[in-house]
């Protein structure tokens, strides 16, 4: 169903209620049942105890109380709630005082919940959210958000009751690294489009966004010491679509925006392969020094930096230096995948020279699992993207102490088609329906990689076939919340039969948000 059609149906339903003379809101004394309970949240909490007798009604007199450390999260929460409710919801200091309140408090949660966990209690008199850090508060707010009616996501005032589902939650993540990847190289997405995706993934407790900033088809970040990377290499995209790039100021703004949603940007410069856009921009990066044409097809494996030329490492040093200076997060992704035209000896030589460059600028290496064969520093994080349960190099890296980021392509790639007739996406790794994407475990998928070896989970979204935000949404939803749950929720609490029921209750929120999601027949959508 298109967004326009969805809104038309919704409008007819509202008009029918008015025509019938039904009240727009419940009377003050009438009990209004909450849409969801604390046990319906996605990702599933560690411990959730519903109590319908403790539902809290948000009203015009409600205030948001917080301490100094929680002020930014409290303002974020108020910004979420004000448009649909029309209430003032002032943010006030301190946790004492009468009247209904949502209380956000840092530093007083159980040590059990750690840095990202939280404790939530909803009673008839108010809401109490406690965490040990502002990260935990922010993630707890995402749970609180789901306990309100779906209409809370509306951008205009809705005349209705605002019931927060009663009960208690104690929650913390299984893995500390929960990530999504957006390919902005094959097709370029504007800063506003990236910010929209940041907002969409933040609500499911994703805490990293991996931006694939370079590939054969386009270079997307300004490098001041090599300006043609952006002004030439940034002008192309798959199929001849318009290109684009981020200035360093725009990139820094994206980093700040993501941080306001408690998400860390992890930038990727893919090398030594997937480098045609760079080599097209600067002929001196080619072994023969001759210009090459741009590429707008989707073939892979043909490009390689010239491993034997000194200028290659000046290029790498300059790019890593400038990118590190505007990236506060600890990781720089150096790619490393599908370097089919680079010999194994050259690949190792390149790694031996590049790894110290990343360390020189104070960053930690992450990259596709192909880097595992170079025996990178034990701090490096190979990202597994294979489709089988065995990879000797990755298993050896895990045995040496490297943490592994799990993104098996036949389970976690968001650009894989749902079924053969899906109008977007590819199918080289197989078809990934919602159940297929959910029904696996990162600690048992790969031989030699167990719970202690896994840093987390990432859901990559490649953009060979994606041009608009609607395209991003259609391929990411409804699968993305499942990957978020795999990364957050206890393994033993996850079952497909229970998850599909909770997932179905998310769809009214997506409709309100305008998310153009795929309505899988595996889920009975609400």
Language-model segments: what does each one mean?
Residues 18-26:
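C-terminal segment of classical bacterial N-terminal signal peptides
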């Amino acid at each position: 169903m298109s967004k326009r059609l969805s809104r038309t149906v919704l409008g007819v339903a509202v008009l029918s209620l008015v025509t019938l003379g039904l009240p727009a809101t419940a009377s003050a004394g009438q009990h209004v049942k909450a849409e969801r309970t604390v046990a319906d949240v996605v990702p599933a909490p560690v411990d959730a105890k519903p109590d319908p007798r403790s539902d809290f009604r948000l009203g015009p007199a409600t205030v948001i109380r917080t301490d100094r450390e929680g002020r930014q999260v409290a303002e974020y929460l108020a910004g979420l709630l004000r448009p649909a409710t029309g209430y003032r919801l002032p943010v006030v200091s301190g946790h004492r005082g009468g009247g209904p309140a949502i209380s956000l408090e840092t530093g007083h949660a159980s040590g059990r919940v750690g840095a990202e966990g939280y404790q939530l209690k909803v009673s008839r008199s108010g809401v109490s959210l406690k965490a040990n850090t502002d990260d935990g508060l922010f993630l707890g707010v995402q749970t609180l958000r789901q306990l309100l009616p779906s209409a809370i996501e509306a951008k205009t005032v809705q005349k209705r009751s605002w019931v927060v589902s009663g009960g208690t939650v104690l929650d913390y993540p299984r893995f500390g690294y929960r990530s999504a990847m957006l390919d902005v190289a094959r097709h370029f997405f504007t800063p506003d489009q990236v910010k929209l995706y940041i907002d969409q993934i933040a609500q499911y407790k994703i805490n990293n966004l991996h931006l694939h900033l370079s590939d054969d088809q386009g270079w997307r970040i300004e490098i001041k010491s090599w300006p043609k990377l952006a002004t030439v290499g940034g002008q192309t995209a798959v199929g001849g679509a318009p290109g684009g790039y981020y200035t360093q100021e725009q990139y820094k703004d994206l980093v700040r925006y993501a941080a306001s949603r408690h998400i860390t940007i992890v930038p990727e410069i893919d090398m030594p392969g997937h480098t045609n856009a760079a080599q097209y921009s600067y002929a001196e990066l080619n072994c023969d020094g001759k210009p090459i044409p741009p590429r707008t097809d989707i073939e892979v494996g043909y490009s390689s930096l010239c491993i034997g030329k000194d200028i290659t490492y000046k290029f790498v040093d300059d790019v890593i230096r400038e990118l590190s200076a505007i990236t506060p997060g600890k990781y720089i992704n150096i790619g490393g995948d599908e370097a089919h035209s680079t010999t194994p000896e050259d690949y190792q030589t390149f790694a031996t020279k590049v790894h110290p460059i990343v360390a020189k600028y104070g960053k930690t290496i992450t990259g596709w699992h192909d880097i595992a064969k170079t025996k990178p520093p034990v701090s490096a994080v190979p990202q597994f993207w294979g489709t089988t349960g065995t990879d000797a190099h990755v298993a050896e890296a895990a045995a040496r102490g490297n943490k592994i980021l799990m993104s098996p392509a036949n389970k976690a790639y968001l650009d894989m088609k749902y079924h053969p007739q899906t109008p977007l996406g590819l199918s080289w790794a197989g078809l990934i329906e919602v159940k297929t994407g959910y029904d696996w475990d990162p600690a048992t998928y790969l031989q030699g990689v167990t719970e202690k070896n896994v840093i987390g989970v990432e859901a990559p979204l490649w953009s060979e076939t994606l041009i608009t935000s609607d395209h991003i949404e259609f391929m990411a939803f409804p699968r993305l919340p499942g990957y978020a749950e795999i990364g957050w929720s206890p393994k033993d609490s996850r079952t497909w039969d229970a998850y599909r029921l909770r997932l179905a209750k998310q769809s009214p929120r997506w409709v309100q948000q305008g998310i153009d999601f795929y309505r899988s027949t595996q889920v009975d959508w609400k």
